[in-house]
């Protein structure tokens, strides 16, 4: 039962019994009066709610919303200006409105579409709109000023469209679009009228923030990635009504009226050519050519500004920094349009060095990310043609399982043949499965000395591990992590490098800086308590002669410098290497990641020798020449390609490290030097004038710098290359007698572009712009000596990209080549085969014969092929009937035959420590030679469109 109450609750008192306070009564009367006035005003209005709310003389000026901007006349007669000189009146920064060229993912894309935010008003300006009575409009015209950043006369046509992010249907999302020519003499103002923007109070903010610009460029050629093409400046929205009272109405009845606005001023424009010399002038209103149907995707629906690869929810262009994780990786995974920067980035034309954390230096550990130490696979065409071999071997395990299920139904079960005590990779991910210990002494700290080496196959073959995990590796790619632990006192410091030696080119007890400097790896100081990086184990597939999985290679720890304080170095120090599994990928094969001469990122991994600096108050400076053409005792894949290029361009990514004691300090400036400039001593005042920022050596011992491409000569060559300086203007303070060491490693070249070719310049004009065109034949083997001619019989040639004549493999005495010609093996095919570990694809051979006279050319030449490998490169007396499974007949002067990749394995080796025809050759060729009247015999070879190399090996400089 509810208890009795003596009085009512406040909410139970009727309103008629309440006593209204003076303030509440005044507010109520004012509200009632305002409502009556609003009703009377609406009743007296001569037009409906769809029109402007307010008196007939109320009009909005652009200054009320967007501030004072340039007049249309000034914009019309202004010239295209540089990116940094663009000044706009819109509150958004011009940097956020710049449209930059974004290289498409593939070369097949006919258009380049760039999405940028549509400039919109701020909350303060929206409030002013509401106060003015701007409630709704059925017709809104939009004017945008466009600043072109390309050269006058550049034939670059662009389409600008406004899209709605609330839908993913392109036909529904596209609001309005129009064309403009960025190479026009006066490309500054475009007008996109007849846009229906429902600017009511409910969805005003959501709709405006959901709009974005889609700029689509046609026939973009020759621009570097991230190049600024144009900028959108001030934007004006005008409300228009089709009434006599609207004195500012520009509403048009048809598109013909809209196009007629472009004919108000008659003048011609330049359409082709980078300058006015020999330019072709055409009419301004020339008909736009048919560019075909547009195909573009909508930005996914989102709240606010659409999320794209270039935008954030705040409408700011995203400049993604490459965050450096603690562990580095050798796996290649190149995001599109990625901008890389390490802890510091040399990012302006004045070479100013800025930091990434708001100008503050940090002492947090940032290890390098060793992405794909082997480099991308080499593919020699822009169009990838699938072959039967690819379909059969793209994923052997999945294909077999699918076949069994199709034959016997889904209930069939595949039994495991692995022992029960084995562990799969999934159970090992993230766990340390092997720990190895070693030690070294002070006398071992010699440049290039291997302090500890571990064979990968020994790890995978250990007890309770090998069977199942090894089976997964043979069917895919395994990513492992190695962590180095070194215990030393804080006063001792020296440089080290963890090296992934896939082909075991470094002996466990070797001292060879030449090989260690070009093998993929990561550098770190000894004062790091732990350092790790990831490496990717590559499997060439199952093969009958694949012995003991020796291709997995070794992990080696190499010394790069001597200790800074030899007296403080203990007699013996301990090393611990821990191994764990990061990931297992069953994707075993693809056709590569791009062209040799046009790569977003090309791994280099060239380590320079240490520069030693003594402590003291005097000026100290370490200089590194970044001449990647310069060959040491060994060189790698990147240098092999550079050897055939007249020059290259690209941004350099450089890891740097300074090894010193914990008590050492000093101000360090990292200074890039271009165009062969030399500085014997750089003053600190000059560095500060150039806006360089110093680093405290006690807080910054290592990092990564991004060195943009800059050259007055247009490219880096053997004689024109940049330098990197480490300047200590105030000297180095530290323990007496200390010697610090500065180390750098050129990790990658971004936006790599090869220029010219040293050997094939006369041929390139007829073969296209690609110097590595697979249409070119390369003289691969040479001319026979006179005493070897007219013997008849068969010439045996194992199918391999290696120049077997230069190696003198199995040639014997019956088939001898001219030594002067055989030594000229400087062609890219032999270089790439020598600097890589595996190959696959089609090779085409052509035998050419010249005779003493035409009467001797009486018999057609014949080529035979067999899948059986013959360990012979030279004369063979084998009978014709025993030679091959396929043959082809040419004419009396030449015969050509193409050999597809028919070996029952995913890849073949180039060669390891020694050339092995049984693991390196795709069968054998036999050429039936003439018996008399022969003057010379030459053999040519070329790689076809499906040819590619994989993985990494170091090559001796003398073996070319």
From Swiss-Prot:
SUPFAM superfamilies: Positive stranded ssRNA viruses. It holds the Pfam family Vp24_capsid. One of its GO terms (biological process) is transport of virus in host, cell to cell. Residues 350-366 have a biased composition (Polar residues). Specific enzymatic cleavages in vivo by the P1 encoded 3C-like protease yield mature proteins. One of its GO terms (cellular component) is viral capsid. Keywords: Capsid protein, Host cell junction, Transport, Viral movement protein, Virion. InterPro entries: Viral_coat, Vp20_capsid, Vp24_capsid, Vp25_capsid. The record marks 374-375, 592-593, 767-768 as: Cleavage. Gene3D superfamilies: 2.60.120.20. Residues 350-370 are annotated as: Disordered. It comes from the Viruses. Capsid proteins VP20, VP24, and VP25 form a capsid enclosing the viral positive strand RNA genome. Together they form an icosahedral capsid pseudo T=3 with a diameter of approximately 30 nm (Potential). This is RNA2 polyprotein. It comes from Cherry rasp leaf virus (isolate Potato/United States).
């Amino acid at each position: 039962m509810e208890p009795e109450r003596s009085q009512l609750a406040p909410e139970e008192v009727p309103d008629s019994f309440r006593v209204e306070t003076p303030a509440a009564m005044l507010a109520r009367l004012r509200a009632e009066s305002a409502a009556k006035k609003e009703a009377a005003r609406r009743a007296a209005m001569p037009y409906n709610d769809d029109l402007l709310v307010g008196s007939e003389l109320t009009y909005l000026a652009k200054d009320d919303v967007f501030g004072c901007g340039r007049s249309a006349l000034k914009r019309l007669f202004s010239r295209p200006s540089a990116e940094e000189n663009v000044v706009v009146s819109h509150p958004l920064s011009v940097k956020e409105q710049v449209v930059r060229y974004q290289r498409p993912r593939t070369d097949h894309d006919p258009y380049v579409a760039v999405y940028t935010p549509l400039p919109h008003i701020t909350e303060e300006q929206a409030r002013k709109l509401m106060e003015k009575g701007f409630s709704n409009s059925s017709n809104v015209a939009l004017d945008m000023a466009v600043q072109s950043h390309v050269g006058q006369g550049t034939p670059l046509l662009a389409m600008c469209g406004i899209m709605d992010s609330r839908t993913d249907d392109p036909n529904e999302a596209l609001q309005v679009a129009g064309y403009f020519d960025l190479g026009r003499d006066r490309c500054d103002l475009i007008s996109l009228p007849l846009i229906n923007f429902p600017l009511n109070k409910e969805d005003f903010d959501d709709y405006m923030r959901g709009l974005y610009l889609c700029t689509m460029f046609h026939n973009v050629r020759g621009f570097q990635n991230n190049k600024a093409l144009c900028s959108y400046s001030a934007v004006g929205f005008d409300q228009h009504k089709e009434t006599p009272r609207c004195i500012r109405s520009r509403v048009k009845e048809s598109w013909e009226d809209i196009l007629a606005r472009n004919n108000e001023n008659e003048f011609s424009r330049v359409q082709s050519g980078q300058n006015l010399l020999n330019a072709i002038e055409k009419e301004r209103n020339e008909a736009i050519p048919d560019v075909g149907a547009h195909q573009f995707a909508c930005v996914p629906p989102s709240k606010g500004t659409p999320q794209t690869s270039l935008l954030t929810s705040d409408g700011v262009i995203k400049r993604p920094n490459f965050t450096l994780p603690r562990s580095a990786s050798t796996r290649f995974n190149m995001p599109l349009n990625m901008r890389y920067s390490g802890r510091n980035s040399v990012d302006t034309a004045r070479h100013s060095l800025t930091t990434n954390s708001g100008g503050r230096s940090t002492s947090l550990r940032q290890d390098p990310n060793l992405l794909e130490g082997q480099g991308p696979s080499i593919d020699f065409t822009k169009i990838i043609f699938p072959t039967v071999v690819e379909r059969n071997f793209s994923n052997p395990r999945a294909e077999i399982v699918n076949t069994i299920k199709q034959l016997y139904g889904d209930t069939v079960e595949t039994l495991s043949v692995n022992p029960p005590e084995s562990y799969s990779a999934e159970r090992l991910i993230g766990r340390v499965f092997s720990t190895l210990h070693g030690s070294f002494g002070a006398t071992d700290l010699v440049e290039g000395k291997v302090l500890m080496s571990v064979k990968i196959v020994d790890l995978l073959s250990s007890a309770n591990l090998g069977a199942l995990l090894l089976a997964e590796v043979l069917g895919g790619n395994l990513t492992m992590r190695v962590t180095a632990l070194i215990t030393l006192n804080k006063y001792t410091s020296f440089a080290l490098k963890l090296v992934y030696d896939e082909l075991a080119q470094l002996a466990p007890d070797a001292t060879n800086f030449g090989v260690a400097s070009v093998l993929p790896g990561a550098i770190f100081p000894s004062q790091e308590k732990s350092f790790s990086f990831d490496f990717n184990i590559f499997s060439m597939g199952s093969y009958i002669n694949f012995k003991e999985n020796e291709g997995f290679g070794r992990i080696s720890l190499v010394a790069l410098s001597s200790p800074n304080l030899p007296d403080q170095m203990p007699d013996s120090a301990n090393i611990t290497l821990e191994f764990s599994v990061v990931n297992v990928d069953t994707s075993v094969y693809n056709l590569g990641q791009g062209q040799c001469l046009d790569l977003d990122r090309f791994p280099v991994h060239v380590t320079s020798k240490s520069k030693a600096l003594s402590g003291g108050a005097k000026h100290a400076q370490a200089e590194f020449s970044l001449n990647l053409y310069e060959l040491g005792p060994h060189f790698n894949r990147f240098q092999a390609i550079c050897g055939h290029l007249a020059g290259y361009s690209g941004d350099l990514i450089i890891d740097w490290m300074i090894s010193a004691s914990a008590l050492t300090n000093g101000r360090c400036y990292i200074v890039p030097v271009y165009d062969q400039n030399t500085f014997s001593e750089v003053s600190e005042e000059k560095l500060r004038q150039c806006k360089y920022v110093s680093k405290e050596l006690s807080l910054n011992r290592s990092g990564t710098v991004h060195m943009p491409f800059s050259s007055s000569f247009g490219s880096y060559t053997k004689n024109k290359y940049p330098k990197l300086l480490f300047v200590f203007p105030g000297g180095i303070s530290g323990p007496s007698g200390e010697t610090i060491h500065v180390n750098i490693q050129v990790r990658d070249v971004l936006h790599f572009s090869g220029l010219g070719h040293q050997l094939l310049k006369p041929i390139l004009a007829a073969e296209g712009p690609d110097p590595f065109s697979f249409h070119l034949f390369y003289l691969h083997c040479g001319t026979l000596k006179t005493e070897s001619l007219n013997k008849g019989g068969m010439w045996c040639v194992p199918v391999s990209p290696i120049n077997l004549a230069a190696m003198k493999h199995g040639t014997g005495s019956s088939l001898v080549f001219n030594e002067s010609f055989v030594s000229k093996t400087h062609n890219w095919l032999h270089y790439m085969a020598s600097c890589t570990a595996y190959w696959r694809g089609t090779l085409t051979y052509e035998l050419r014969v010249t005779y003493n006279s035409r009467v001797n050319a009486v018999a057609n030449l014949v080529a035979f092929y067999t899948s059986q490998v013959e360990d012979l490169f030279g004369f063979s007396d084998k009978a014709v009937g025993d030679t091959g499974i396929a043959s082809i007949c040419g004419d009396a002067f030449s015969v050509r035959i193409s050999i597809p990749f028919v070996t029952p394995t995913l890849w073949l080796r180039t060669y390891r420590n020694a050339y092995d025809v049984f693991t390196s050759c795709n069968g054998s060729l036999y050429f039936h030679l003439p018996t008399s009247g022969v003057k010379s015999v030459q053999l040519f070879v070329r790689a076809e469109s499906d040819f590619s190399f994989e993985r990494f090996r170091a090559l001796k400089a003398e073996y070319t």
